Amino acid sequence: MSKDEIIDILDLIIESIHLVQERFSRIRVPDDFVLAQEGVTLLDAISMRLQVIGESVKRIEKTDLSLLQRYADIEWDKIARFRDLVSHHYEHVDHEIVYDICETHIPKLREVIQKMRTAISESYEL
């Protein structure tokens, strides 16, 4: 995979994170996802963007696993597994887990993805 292709994937992840954070800003507690139709709609929309993030991570993993290994503080395998859950067993998606992902893990992921993109843009050669 070329440097430009990886940057495009990272840009897609950054865009998805932005949308997740924008949508999640309307959620105060986990049950906000299930107590009203708007919350259910937000849960669906956020879950789909988490799926996009997971699919993008899997694409990088297939072609340049060493890139992900350089940023070992992110649990890349869990991101990929959550993508699989959303894709193949959506009925088992737990709103409390989605809340935790958005509240706890997405801000750190955004920071790391932006660092990766900067590093690749400046010096990374495949």
Question: What do these predicted regions represent?
Answer:
Residues M1-L126:
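Solvent-exposed interaction patches of small proteins and small membrane subunits
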